[in-house]
């Protein structure tokens, strides 16, 4: 069971929200734990509706879905339906009880193959009590991206599943989704869901894929202009709270990949080729970790567009979440060093990037000395933003 620290100015008010335990204080935050009584049922629902390689079921997809369940519960999105916030985009401006649940349209930005959209559909729909739920997932990835199943294949499978009536996908970015023409056009009857009635935006482990810090800042500006009431974030934090440096390999490897990406952008910018690089899909020469802003930089970018943190917290991923370990293993392989050298960076930049690799190897060596087979994923930070 994942432990979650939370800082909140508003108490969660729905059956999916994480429950307070009051067992101890951590740096002024209250330690809470997620209620996992129904998590296995939710995970089974997701596994029955999602397209994935069976051989990766237990090692990859069960922990991946469990992590997203922890995130969605911490976000407490359901409160937008049961107790609408004051503001725009369909909220009635009151919190009087009793309140009939309102329809909920969530925009999942950087949805990838749809894990987070599926998790929200499976977790939230049973509690809508007759109100409508729809998750629109958007991503700029090519339809043929992904292996062994492509983005197009996983999207088609999911939308044809039992969860599919609550999910749709578009290949576009937030600026296109919230284009002025869509926002300014009158909404005819039956137009729900649309760009004009988004109740919340989610970014679940997707901000690290953004190409530049400026692209993250532009996103928050776009969301502010669209008058979205709430934004929910979840991203790795570049911090580890476990003892013995168990998360160091993941942290250092992510820094190496982010520095490589920034260095390549810097070089291509000088060559007037940055736009081509930004459209390049992840691969041996474009790691999954791109701009990879830390928590402070994300909050700063959001604040510049008028967003404030309403609630936030952190949690340590479960021990069986191996994605951090796999990212770190990629960095210590010879292929990573070869990819760095193939980019044609300046000697100084190449030395700086490759100079982080020994630290990752040393982190693995310390774990081996302690009898630990795998490194742990770094802490996850989540937040709810409002304007």
Swiss-Prot record:
Signal peptide: none annotated. SUPFAM superfamilies: S-adenosyl-L-methionine-dependent methyltransferases. It is an enzyme of class 2 (transferase). Transmembrane segments: none annotated. GO terms for molecular function: methyltransferase activity. Keywords: Methyltransferase, S-adenosyl-L-methionine, Transferase. One of its GO terms (biological process) is methylation. It comes from the Eukaryota. Residues 98-223 are annotated as: Methyltransferase domain. The keyword Nucleotide-binding does not apply. InterPro entries: SAM-dependent_MTases_sf. Its EC number is 2.1.1.-. Pathway: Mycotoxin biosynthesis. Methyltransferase; part of the gene cluster that mediates the biosynthesis of the phomopsins, a group of hexapeptide mycotoxins which infects lupins and causes lupinosis disease in livestock. Within the pathway, phomM' acts as an S-adenosylmethionine-dependent alpha-N-methyltransferase that catalyzes two successive N-methylation reactions, converting N-desmethyl-phomopsin A to phomopsin A and phomopsin A further to an N,N-dimethylated congener called phomopsin E. This is Methyltransferase phomM'. It comes from Diaporthe leptostromiformis (Lupinosis disease fungus).
């Amino acid at each position: 069971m994942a432990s979650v620290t939370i800082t909140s100015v508003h108490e969660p008010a729905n059956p999916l929200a994480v429950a307070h335990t009051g067992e101890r204080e951590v740096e002024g935050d209250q330690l809470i734990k997620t209620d996992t009584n129904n998590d296995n049922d939710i995970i089974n629902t997701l596994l029955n509706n999602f397209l994935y390689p069976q051989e990766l079921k237990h090692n990859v997809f069960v922990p991946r879905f469990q992590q997203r369940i922890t995130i969605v519960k911490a976000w407490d999105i359901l409160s937008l339906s049961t107790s609408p916030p004051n503001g725009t985009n369909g909220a009635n401006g009151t919190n009087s009880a009793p309140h009939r649940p309102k329809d909920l349209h969530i925009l999942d930005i950087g949805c990838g193959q749809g894990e987070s959209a599926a998790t929200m559909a499976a977790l939230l729909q049973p509690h809508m009590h007759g109100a409508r739920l729809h998750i629109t997932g958007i991503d700029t990835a090519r339809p043929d991206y992904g292996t062994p199943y492509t983005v197009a294949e996983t999207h088609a499978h999911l939308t044809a599943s039992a969860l599919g009536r609550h999910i749709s996908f578009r290949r576009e970015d937030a600026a296109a989704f919230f284009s002025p023409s869509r926002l300014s056009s009158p909404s005819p009857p039956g137009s729900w869901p649309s760009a004009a009635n988004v109740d919340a935006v989610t970014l679940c482990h997707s901000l690290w894929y953004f190409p530049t810090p400026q692209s993250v800042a532009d996103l928050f500006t776009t969301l502010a202009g669209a008058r979205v009431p709430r934004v929910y974030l979840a991203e790795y934090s570049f911090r580890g709270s476990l003892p013995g440096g168990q998360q160091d390999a993941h942290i250092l490897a992510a820094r190496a990949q982010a520095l490589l990406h920034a260095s390549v952008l810097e070089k291509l910018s000088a060559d007037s080729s940055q736009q081509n690089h930004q459209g390049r899909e992840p691969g041996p020469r474009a790691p999954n970790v791109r701009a990879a802003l830390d928590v402070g930089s994300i909050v700063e970018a959001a604040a510049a567009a008028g967003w404030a943190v309403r609630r936030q917290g952190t949690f340590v991923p479960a021990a069986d979440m191996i994605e951090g370990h796999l990212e770190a293993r990629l960095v210590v392989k010879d292929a990573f060093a070869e990819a760095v050298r193939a980019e044609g960076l300046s000697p100084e930049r190449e030395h700086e990037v490759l100079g982080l690799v020994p630290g990752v190897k040393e982190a693995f060596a310390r774990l081996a000395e302690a009898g630990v087979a795998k490194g742990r994923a770094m802490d996850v930070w989540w937040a709810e933003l409002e304007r």
